[in-house]
Regions:
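N-proximal short alpha-helices
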Residues: 3, 7, 29, 63-66, ...
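Polar helix-capping/helix-linker motif
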Residues: 17-20, 24, 76, 180
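Generic alpha-helical structural signal
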Residues: 5, 9-12, 28-31, 121
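Generic N-terminal amphipathic, Lys/Arg-enriched alpha-helix
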Residues: 1-22
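Glycine-rich phosphate-binding loops that contact phosphosugars or nucleotide phosphates
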Residues: 40, 45-184
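A short, well-structured juxtamembrane/interface segment
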Residues: 19-40
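Residue-level detector of alpha-helical secondary structure
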Residues: 10, 29, 33-36, 58, ...
Length: 184
């Protein structure tokens, strides 16, 4: 059994090893890309499943409200279930990206605590085919899967098998990005 002290120590340990150079690289890419494409529909698509989807929605809200960045998540339940029914769960995100005319001027943020979500991997592959930029955060077994789908190598692997630790660390990373992009 894990004590709360052990749990908090684990979170602190994982936060202390966040590679700030990767986070800074993502902020730099977002700033550059957003300035380059301002006025032409530059958007940030954020995808995840379960708790990662909740994080995606939270960060999307902050990017829209605090940073004036057009951020989207697939949080429309009727659309999600329709796409899942028609195209399968593994293809639903790609179909959503197509409906929203995702292109090379857009940016994808992918969050997968398990590190093996097929729909997230397909979204990354689709993003690569569109020549767009990506940033991924993943945990657990993703260490051996996700890097091959992150063609521009902007990713962070959270080396834990605890969903709570992965999700909290993911959210801290993304809040760090938001804080770096806030427009006063």
């Amino acid at each position: 059994m894990v004590t709360t002290t052990d749990y908090f120590d684990s979170i602190q340990q994982h936060v202390s090893v966040i590679p700030s150079d990767v986070v800074d690289k993502v902020v730099k890419i977002w700033r550059h890309e957003y300035q380059k494409h301002v006025g032409v529909g530059k958007r940030v698509f954020i995808v995840g499943n379960g708790g990662s989807c909740a994080i995606a929605e939270h960060i999307s809200t902050d990017l829209n409200k605090r940073c004036k960045v057009k951020a989207l998540t697939l949080s429309n339940n009727s659309l999600l279930t329709a796409l899942t029914n028609d195209y399968g769960q593994e293809n639903a995100l790609v179909e959503w990206m197509k409906i929203n005319h995702f292109d090379k001027t857009d940016f994808l943020v992918a969050i997968s605590s398990s590190g093996k979500s097929k729909n997230i991997l397909r979204a990354l592959e689709y993003t690569h085919n569109c020549l767009a930029s990506t940033f991924s955060i993943f945990g657990m077994s993703g260490k051996n899967i996700f890097p091959q789908y992150n063609y521009d190598h902007s990713y962070i692997h959270i080396d834990s098998f605890n969903y709570g630790v992965i999700e909290l660390t993911s959210e801290i990373i993304l809040h760090g990005i938001v804080e770096s992009l806030v427009i006063e």
